Amino acid sequence: MSEPEKSDTDRIFVHDFVLPVRIGAFDREHDAPQQVRFNVDARIARPARVPERLPEVFSYDLITDGIRAIVAQGHIHLVETLAERIAASVLAHPQILSVTVRVEKLEVGPGSVGVEITRAK
């Protein structure tokens, strides 16, 4: 029996993170925040050894704190712009190799609408 192939990366993710966001290009969207769902998957270099303490790992709090900081900067016209800013924020961390960001506006129509982007260093 062959040994499974080892990956040189791990994945850290934040899924179904929802915040009120001032977003939208239309005048009617400037009046109040909308609920927006964020899904972020980031690839990090696999550590040389199994981490045993929090300072040895990339914390998902860095992702959620980054999203909160971007949203707090004020009104954003496009989900594409928001996704790009989040991707840049995550990629600014040296451990991150690539990131996929999905941003969904939850209050437009009967479902959700949004964008998903993948960026790498």
Q: Where would I find each of the regions flagged by the language model?
A:
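N-terminal, polar/charged subdomain of small-to-medium soluble alpha/beta proteins
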Residues: 1-121
